[in-house]
Amino acid sequence: MAQFDVRNTSEGALVIDCQSNLLRHLNTRLVVPLLPADEFEVVARRLNPLFTIEGTDYVMYTQFAATLAVSQLGEVMMNLDDHSLIIVGALDVLVTGV
């Protein structure tokens, strides 16, 4: 498992794994859901960045961050490491407001 992997959950949701690779030995992961952009409102641009996954636009709904058991995560679809500053920035907005 790698930080910023995009995965399906056992319930069919799409999530970004935001947990540090240094903590990969844990049996849980901090994830943020990716919700279809045409169905969910962007509350704040820095809090809710947009990503295109397999030709579809998704909103990172940072305010819905949660932990899931590793067993609830499916195969890796892609990795968003190239967007790490945007993802970490969204988490910073959630935690610090900045």
Where are the regions that the model predicts?
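Residues at structural and domain junctions
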Residues: M1, D17, L73-M77
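Compact nucleic-acid interaction/catalytic patches
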Residues: Q3-G12, I16-P49
